Structure formats: structure tokens, C-alpha cells
Swiss-Prot record:
Disulfide bonds: none
Pfam families: DALR_2, tRNA-synt_1e
Record: residues binding ATP: 273
Source species of the chain: Prochlorococcus marinus (strain NATL2A)
Protein name: Cysteine--tRNA ligase
Amino acid sequence: MSLKFTNTLSKKKEDFISINPNQVKIYCCGVTVYDLCHLGHARSYLNWDVLRRFLIWKGFEVKFVQNFTDIDDKIINRANKEGCSTDELSERNIDEFHKDMDTLSILRPTSMPRATKCLHQIINFIEELEQKKVAYSSNGDVYFSVDKHKNYGKLSGREIEDQIDNAAGRLKTNQKESKKNSLDFALWKKSNSGEVSYSSPWGNGRPGWHIECSAMVKQELGESIDIHLGGSDLIFPHHENEIAQSEACNGKELAKYWLHNGMVNVGGEKMSKSLGNFTTIRSLLEEDISPMTLRFFVLQTNYRKPLDFTEEALKAASKGWERLNNCLSFGYIYKIKDQSKNEIFLDKPIKKSANTKLDKNSFKLLSDFEKYMDDDLNTSGALSILFELSQPIRKIINFLKEKDINEVDQDELNQVFNKWELLSELAGVLGLKVNLNQEKPKNNPELDTNKIEELIKNRSLAKANKDFLLADKIRADLKNIGIDLIDKPKGVTEWKQLSD
């Protein structure tokens, strides 16, 4: 089966064929950095992280670009409210964004351009649109002429005529005077007195939201890309407007494939900051929800479908991840001596291995996993394969609760280790990173205080190097396996096992 995606542009599931063989260029719309990220952001970026990991596993070279909108009305309003500059607010929230994404083991993009760092490219892009007579300036603003783009509405399926009256009713008085058409959208906005602004041929102002992405795509990836990503709430107007301005400027198709993730719902409504029904990633993790539980929860639902967020669903995901993690931990306990040298413990993509030692059943499961993922990233189906691979490992784990590993038939044990290696590889494709298991077999000689002491030493070094993110992560990892740390004077750290 070939790799297929549901393309919002064609409204069909299509075979994926990259523009250049073995190379994929991807652009993902990033966050507006005025606040902490919520679960809706986590859902989106976890899904696209898995897409990227899967493409790399299949042998593609992936260039993945994701932007930051660091100047916007929301940022200006929040900065005024907090009494800080827009730069200070943006910088702080960009740092917090990285902390959240790193904690969730989301691979950092190849490039993360910021709107304020791309002003030259944005202004040049707008000037090109003016030269092509598809943009016009008015009272310090610059607008895109929607009626000059014949295919406007091709992504969202909206007809221009159906939108004109609705748009006209939403216009402010000054916009009615400036716009030629109620659907025309801003490429450059004149700044109000006292607002942050940047110089331009049209006077002081700031870029419109849509033009940022078009300029950054062109700067980072060229005029045409393979895949454009975002939430379904961005289809109109943001992505529709991106297509219009990019294709009018470049005369080429902006993206072959448009993939959109569904929304996270709470009580039947979309989770959003405007509705006040959002849960931040930070607050979830502070409630002892592990990063891998959150990833597992998200991957149980296809990326295109709505994801219902309930406490019950999160608890079920926690139990499911615990079962899978117990099996992933098995190889570390009995085979892998150095965690730092094994790919399954690291936040990096995994490439497909030769898998020469697999039995017939394991080859079939490997094939089924790839078929599920090839079918529009069917992550729930892929997870079912991981649990099927886990069954013989679980059997051995249960045996070892009462017996010694030397009592297991060596051929059988070798086959189980082979299955574990495949399980670890496929879990890595989904970005599921093993946590050392709380549920150790009773006779396991490597429930090993040496490993705990080594992690504590690594944490102390991280603190000495002021790498507090790593130090906090080591503490969290130890807590996940039932170990609590107590920091004492003079840099001494003691530990104790948490009671059930």
C-alpha cells in the first residue's frame, strides 16, 4: 500500500508523491506567542511530530518549518496589560513553548522563523503583489484584492458571492472607507498612535497575519512545498488567504497537500482561550499526567477527527500507556545496560532497521503497522499493533515475577528480545519514549540502585551547568518510576521509594 493522506484541497484521500524524490518540504502554522500553550496546541503538534517521524522512518529527508507569530493584536493587548514590551512577552512565551514541546518529546523544527525577523521578506512580498496589480494601498493599509484571484475559495469550498454580505456586515467604519471589496484582507496594517510599529513604503505599521506565513514559506522552503499543516480552524480565512497571495505572487501552487487536524472538544465545544474552557499543557503535566500518557491519549484518535477531552478518557490512556511502557521497559531491565546509548530513550527520529531476525508473525505485524500508518496516519491502528507485539513480552514479564530469567528457554527469550526491539522501534516512530518501569519483577537484580544514583548524579551535573530543564526532567522521570528525591544542604540529594 502506498502512503496516502486526506487532502483538504481535493477533499479526497490521495497517494503522496513528493515534488522531489526522497525529500519532503513541510510548513506548519505555529503559535501566536502571547500565552502558554493549551491541549489543542499539544494535539496539533503531537500529530505533526508523528507525521514527521514516520516520513523519516520511511526514508525521506524532511525539512520541517514552523513559524512564530510574534507581533499581533493579542500580543500588543497582553503586553499593555502586563506592562511589558511586545518583545519581552514574545521572548518569554517562546521559551515556554520550547519547554512544553521538549517535555512532550516533540522534535524541534528544522527552522522556526519569527514574523519580526522576516519584515524585509514580508515587505518585498507585498511589493510584488502590488506590482502584479493584485494588492492596493489605502490610508496606510495595504489590502489583497480577492476578486483578482480566480480560484479564491478552492480550499474551503466557499464561494466569493456567499461571503461578501457576511464580510460587509463585520467591517469597521474605517475599513469600509479603505477597502474596495468587503472580502479584501490586510497585508499591511497602519499602526495606531503609540503602538509598536515598523517602517515600510506605506508608512509605519505591521504585517497582516496571513502574509507572514506566505513570506516565510518562500524564504525557508521556496515557492512550492509538499505539505502544509494546521488546525481545521485555520482553513478559512488563514489558509485560504495564504493560497491566494502566494499563488498570485509566485504563479505556482503553494502546496500539493493540505492536512488539517481536528479540534479538541470540552463538553461538546472547541477548546479555546476565547471561550475560557482551555487546559494548558503545563497544568496537565503538573497534575501528574506524564508526557507519554498525553501523547498516547492524542494518538488514540485519528488526527482529522475531533478529540473529546474528559478525565475518564485521560485515565484510560494512562492505564493503556502503563501497560505498553511495562513491555517497553523489559529490554532495558534485562538487556540494555546504558540508557544513554540506545535510540529508544532519546528524543530523536528512528530510521527503519533491517529487522533480519524477525519471525513470520513479527514481519506481518511490522507490515500491518506500516499499512495503518500509510493509510492517512491511522495511529489508533498502529497502537493496536504495538499491543499485539507486547503480548509475548507481557507473558515473560509475568513469568519473571515468580521465576528467574535463567529458567526461560533461551530460544524463546531471544525471540522475545527480537519482538521487543521491533516494539521499541515502532513505538519510536510514534514518539513514544520508554520510562523506566515501576512494575519490576520481584527477582530482578537490576532494580538497581546504581541506575538511580547515576540519574541523581546526572541531575546534579545538570543543575551545576544551569540546565534546569534537564534537571527537572530527570526528577520527573524518577518520580514516574516511583522514586522521590529529597534535596539536602551542601548539594546532597537523597531518594526514597514512593508508597503505592
